[in-house]
Amino acid sequence: MLAKSSINAPFAKSVLAWYDKFGRKHLPWQQNKTLYGVWLSEVMLQQTQVATVIPYFERFIKTFPNITALANASQDEVLHLWTGLGYYARARNLHKAAQKVRDEFNGNFPTNFEQVWALSGVGRSTAGAILSSVLNQPYPILDGNVKRVLARYFAVEGWSGEKKVENRLWALTEQVTPTTRVADFNQAMMDIGAMVCMRTKPKCDLCPLNIDCLAYKNTNWEKFPAKKPKKAMPEKTTYFLILSKNGKVCLEQRENSGLWGGLFCFPQFEDKSSLLHFLAQEKVTHYQEWPSFRHTFSHFHLDIHPIYAEMESTLCVEQANLDWRKVMESTKEYQSNLSSAVKYWYDPQNPEPIGLAQPVKNLLIQFVRNHYGKNSIL
């Protein structure tokens, strides 16, 4: 599990020489490094590009300057700042891990590898990245960029997500990572993957490893790593009810598990007739269909059909008798218990700090534009 190479080994020497000239050294989390800041950045960078992460990281650090501040925040506050970054389980795990550090480590981020790895949302590579970056502990990493560099350099066949291929790549990253200057080396490997050995159109002529890179020698870089076996993306449909009363909109909070867990969303229906039946029950006769759109998750497409209606009754949705939340019955991720869901009238003109699913946020912005004729402050 530890780094095994010498700093003078050809691979490490070439990587570090490149880093000294071209590596990224001015990212926000690289300045005045702390375990908390690097941990936060590493979690945000999981499946998300650096340019996207930077503004989110800066907002988080400003709002929650230390791990205790994050732990003491409500989940709604955390999800609110995460809105738009996607993969919301990361935010929930981040919050859960912060509370564990507060409660079990007196608010001090652990420096033991096993303890870091045991935190919610932290895998082996993330734990190694945190401890190597801040404390220069000799732990290798294996994120997507590093996988690509190693797969091409050593011509490792197979999809990098396959267990036996991943194990092979772990053995290789242990082999090439030096026991000193580990922080610089790991950052360099990520930078080479992001800036030179890119997924498409790699700049092989500029790569410090091209002399011995097998994919470069054989001019077949596109073979490594092999693509994930393709499966057809399922297509699903849902109907959003944008139910307005006195300029406010009814939202409900989803269960913590599953898609959009813990976020506030519009009431959802599996089909249009169910939605219209609910409106009829509430004696709402006028509605407006807004343009449909597609939201794509990592494993399926969701076609969203928004329907807008105004409600004159003083009753909020939780007082309705109709169980309108039998949503997407064939999809466990979309099942919800009406009686346990948290619902309230949300004022987009004076928004509360809650987490919103990105399609919901976009529709609320459209609601403000339609209702008030101006841009939203969301």
From Swiss-Prot:
Coiled-coil spans in chain: none
Keywords assigned: 4Fe-4S, DNA damage, DNA repair, Glycosidase, Hydrolase, Iron, Iron-sulfur, Metal-binding
Enzyme class, spelled out: hydrolase
Enzyme active site: 42 (proton donor/acceptor)
Site-annotated residues for Transition state stabilizer: 143
Family listed: Belongs to the Nth/MutY family.
GO annotation, biological process: base-excision repair; mismatch repair
Disulfide pairings: none
Residue positions binding [4Fe-4S] cluster: 197, 204, 207, 213
Cofactor: [4Fe-4S] cluster
Protein name: Adenine DNA glycosylase
PANTHER family membership: ADENINE DNA GLYCOSYLASE
Organism: Haemophilus influenzae (strain ATCC 51907 / DSM 11121 / KW20 / Rd)
Gene Ontology molecular function terms on file: 4 iron, 4 sulfur cluster binding; 8-oxo-7,8-dihydroguanine DNA N-glycosylase activity; adenine/guanine mispair binding; metal ion binding; oxidized purine DNA binding; purine-specific mismatch base pair DNA N-glycosylase activity
EC identifiers of the protein: 3.2.2.31
Catalytic reaction(s) noted: Hydrolyzes free adenine bases from 7,8-dihydro-8-oxoguanine:adenine mismatched double-stranded DNA, leaving an apurinic site
Record text on subunit structure and interactions: Monomer.
Summary of the function given for this chain in its UniProt record: Adenine glycosylase active on G-A mispairs. MutY also corrects error-prone DNA synthesis past GO lesions which are due to the oxidatively damaged form of guanine: 7,8-dihydro-8-oxoguanine (8-oxo-dGTP).
Pfam family, one: NUDIX_4
Cofactor-binding details, from the entry: Binds 1 [4Fe-4S] cluster. The cluster does not appear to play a role in catalysis, but is probably involved in the proper positioning of the enzyme along the DNA strand.
Classification via SUPFAM superfamilies: DNA-glycosylase, Nudix
